[in-house]
Amino acid sequence: MLKKYAVDQLKEGMVVGQAVYKEDMSVLLGEGTVLNQQMIDSLSERNIVSVEIREEDGEEALAPMPQKSQGVQGAPAKTIPLKEPILDEGYVRDYGDCFIELKSLFEVTKAHGSVDKDSAETLAQNILPLCSGAKAVAHIHNMTPKGEYTIHHSLHVAILAGLMGKWLKMPRKDQLRLITAGALILIGNLRIEQAMLDKEGVLTPDERKIMQEHPKFGHELIMAGGLGEDKEIAEAVLQYHERGDGSGYPRGLVKEEIGKFARILAIMDMYDAMASDRSYAKKRSPFEVFNILSDDIMNGRLDTDFGFRFIRRVCHSLNGNWVKLSNGEAGKIIYIDESRLAALPVVQTMDGEFMDLNLRKDVKVEYLLTSREIEEE
């Protein structure tokens, strides 16, 4: 039998149960290859998320002695991709715990009229372990949130912010502060009627004006408590809807008038909002979102360095995810060209066909499938 393992769970001696492909679509590790540490490190460096491992009687099939890779050059054999979603039970459990913790923080904030500093900082420490590269990106897309968009979106932004902090090599203290700010971007929604937050369709001009007050409301709730001593966190919540060309809100700031944390969170917020189902809009393909973000970067609305860095890292963390294609088929992402910004993926469909969407202009990715949607395919 075969079992999917995240790359960081692989051990020397495990036996590859299904071929792993290189960038040129030749085989990197052939079926039956016995893993050594060098191979495992190579998989991690290539942003490969998971590998199918051969098991016997429910236990890992460890080879008795190391062997050379049986990978071969040339076109890959036509195999059928397995449908198991990339979900780690421990990650899902820890995400659920952080979700409950964040929801409680929102409820206490609403009751007391201020954000509790200790609770917010403890939450950030609990979120930090969830910020684990490709695994974090895969789980954000593969899990199936049930309602509570405000909390899920805030938690997603916090996780993506933690990832960005690591990619920028921020000190751990600053990573935690950025996570805290990300978790609180929608805290101001507590002062907006739930019916308006849940409204389907376009907001009226008056409703839009009220909605655009939520950064101010959030800033006030932070400043009312001890967390207000950290001006950068409070500023980030106030400014994350500002844009470099002055078209944002609530103050119409431009370029360097916008704080560093706010410029980072603007990107995280846009990405997750468009890649998620909302009451008034269906989720989009991350690759479509990358194009929108790229346009905003080129037009000076989003920070150039943070924006391009985020797109490149997240784009190449999507390997191994399943997507719904515009022709109605489902496909598994098996390769994304790391040399190109926001490159389209090569996918393998359920009948084993390989499809390079950089060349197939008649087919595009509609959206990423959740674990539940994968099971229904």
Q: What are the residue ranges of the model-derived segments?
A:
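Acidic/His-rich, divalent-metal-binding segments that scaffold phosphate/diphosphate chemistry
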Residues: 70-212, 223-230
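Terminal helices and disordered tails flanking the catalytic cores of nucleotide-processing hydrolases
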Residues: 1-109, 283-377
